Amino acid sequence: MSSRLGAVPATSGPTTFKQQRSTRIVGAKNSRTQCSIKDNSFQYTIPHDDSLSGSSSASSCEPVSDFPASFRKSAYWMKMRRIKPAATSHVEGSGGVSAKGKRKPRQEEDEDYREFPQKKHKLYGRKQRPKTQPNPKSQARRIRKEPPVYAAGSLEEQWYLEIVDKGSVSCPTCQAVGRKTIEGLKKHMENCKQEMFTCHHCGKQLRSLAGMKYHVMANHNSLPILKAGDEIDEPSERERLRTVLKRLGKLRCMRESCSSSFTSIMGYLYHVRKCGKGAAELEKMTLKCHHCGKPYRSKAGLAYHLRSEHGPISFFPESGQPECLKEMNLESKSGGRVQRRSAKIAVYHLQELASAELAKEWPKRKVLQDLVPDDRKLKYTRPGLPTFSQEVLHKWKTDIKKYHRIQCPNQGCEAVYSSVSGLKAHLGSCTLGNFVAGKYKCLLCQKEFVSESGVKYHINSVHAEDWFVVNPTTTKSFEKLMKIKQRQQEEEKRRQQHRSRRSLRRRQQPGIELPETELSLRVGKDQRRNNEELVVSASCKEPEQEPVPAQFQKVKPPKTNHKRGRK
């Protein structure tokens, strides 16, 4: 009973479960610390029970178990039992727990935390933090490097001072490459011993030919390429500009006060001719219309003006030739051959014809670019399409889901389609079926087309300038205007038919004899009127009437298919 009683600490009052647990943990820690000391570190005697000392000494260095008797007796328990430890001063001096219950130093707490982290967490109520290892890189960064020391008056010292002052040092050989460290500069100088390429425009030196070409292309693209006789080689110049545009994506103006850039060679050349010039010089460069004197800045604008305002572009008469033709003289070419005046005039007229062709395409791309109508406003009629029931459409959709294709239902037709819309369009023009669909008809020239894309292309290419109504004041749609025009044509046909019938009725009246002079005049008028009717009303398919001679007027009237008239 003594051993069992000795295992549980005696308390003066009722104790809770947490207090008992904390005392057990403290006792276990004391046993571990005391096991590291000599066996005679704690020497005590129990006056009443000799067996207790042997059992306690035997269990002092044993591993801790869940059984309460295996725990080392705590200082609180020994105090309650009036047991005085022999080496109390030694334990306190070595950092142990004092009799007053003070907490151990931080070093021993960390050792206990590494061995039993969960118990540490339960005892002190602290959060369990993950074990972190110091980063060697961060420690290396914290170490401040000492500045390098170079010999006084050496190049390295000069380079170092320049790096400290400006942030970088340029290569003394090429003066084109900069480095931020002396080691990088030395590494560059090992490969910078070759012959340098010098730009003949600005004197800059580059190490590679590709770098020199890119430098000239990017910074000196406005300088033309000259031939041997200081003449501009235009094909080579355009080829160079084309290469620059392909690599850089744009051509920029090289004037200091101009920051314009262009994505086309024509726009760049047009800008270069006029950039930086005064109003007087620009006025001299304008092209004036020889009909009305209206000035234009470009040749294409003048050609469009001549085509739209003054009809087709015609050749200039001798008296009205422009000054550029009058000033042409017999100048020798670079090859020594003399070009004739007629050849120069022919070249000029060919250029005018080329500009006229350009003017045909130019308004469609520039002027009417924002005015292109949609498909609903194009002037053409659509033919009627066959109608299908919902059962047939559902069957077609099912076949497409199963077989991924559908065949034309008309006998003898082997057309296969992968969509219902494609089959519908095919059935509208299939000749093997019962449905006869019409054709797409252009309402501007009455031309018929099989496909809708064909009539659209025809209208956009042939009738590009007739997309819209001629009269801009009207607000009616094109369909209404076409209906009104058809009504007017029908009314005109009816009037002509009515006039012809009235003339026939008058000639067929019996018992009326006219004198020969009046009869001859009457017959001449009838002949002229009949000829006009044949020309105008050819679509009405009126029966042709032969001219009646004057001598047969009284004997036999002309035969007609009309049964109306007085008998």
Curated annotation (Swiss-Prot):
Primary site of residence: nucleus
Compartments in which it is found: Nucleus
A single GO molecular function term of this UniProt record: DNA binding
One Pfam family recorded for the sequence: zf-C2H2
Stretches for region Disordered: 1-32, 86-148, 486-567
Keyword terms of this UniProt record: DNA-binding, Isopeptide bond, Metal-binding, Nucleus, Repeat, Transcription, Transcription regulation, Ubl conjugation, Zinc, Zinc-finger
Residue location of crosslink Glycyl lysine isopeptide (Lys-Gly) (interchain with G-Cter in SUMO2): 18, 84, 227, 333
Signal sequence coordinates: none
Zinc finger (C2H2-type): 197-220, 287-310, 406-430, 440-463
GO cellular component: nucleus
Comp. bias regions, Basic residues: 119-130, 495-508, 556-567
Biased composition (Polar residues): 12-23
Sequence ranges of Basic and acidic residues compositional bias: 523-532
Domain of life: Eukaryota
Summary of the function given for this chain in its UniProt record: May be involved in transcriptional regulation.
Family membership: Belongs to the krueppel C2H2-type zinc-finger protein family.
Protein name as it appears in the record: Zinc finger protein 512
Annotated source species: Pongo abelii (Sumatran orangutan)
